[in-house]
């Protein structure tokens, strides 16, 4: 037993004498990859509104239709700098996966969610969160009623802006259509006069 103690004492387990300068745990990558620029397709858009919220979609395809959580993250209202189109975009917090992506149209209407002053419900004809666009009934819930009201105010401003822009574009299209119709009438009259002139000769 004494011999076992002696051998244990002789064995030095301390790390004081080891030279740390020889240890260099630096690894070179096997394959070098060039840095890639990541595009979110938000570069050409101006951020009008951004706030944290939780999004739900109404799953009517189930046997028992119910609200299903789609994600928690920042909801944004983005306006395209050239086209002027405004869309609602929401990404999940950690994965940054899109959970809502659709244009705001004049027909959209935010309705209060039953029993809550901090949630809104609305319909969209084409939500692009999944691979293919599909109509959705969405609900969004904010931290408090004040944040929910801020969202509604900005959403309504955007909706009215789109409505006014479409009215202006619509009246411009009508003016253009009338001008084209007048030109067509003038052309047909000229053709008739040419035909009349040929018949007279």
UniProtKB/Swiss-Prot annotation:
Renumbered residue ranges of the record's region Disordered: 1-35, 163-201
Composition bias, Basic and acidic residues: 1-26
Residues that bear N-acetylalanine: 2
Modified residues (N6-succinyllysine): 150
Sites bearing Phosphoserine, chain numbering: 21, 60, 188
Pfam families: Ran_BP1 (PF00638)
Domain of life the protein comes from: Eukaryota
A GO term for molecular function: cadherin binding
Functional description taken from the UniProt entry: Plays a role in RAN-dependent nucleocytoplasmic transport. Alleviates the TNPO1-dependent inhibition of RAN GTPase activity and mediates the dissociation of RAN from proteins involved in transport into the nucleus. Induces a conformation change in the complex formed by XPO1 and RAN that triggers the release of the nuclear export signal of cargo proteins. Promotes the disassembly of the complex formed by RAN and importin beta. Promotes dissociation of RAN from a complex with KPNA2 and CSE1L. Required for normal mitotic spindle assembly and normal progress through mitosis via its effect on RAN.
Quaternary structure note: Interacts with RAN (via C-terminus of GTP-bound form) but not with GDP-bound RAN. Identified in a complex composed of RAN, RANGAP1 and RANBP1. Identified in a complex that contains TNPO1, RAN and RANBP1. Identified in a complex that contains CSE1L, KPNA2, RAN and RANBP1. Identified in a complex with nucleotide-free RAN and RCC1.
Name of protein: Ran-specific GTPase-activating protein
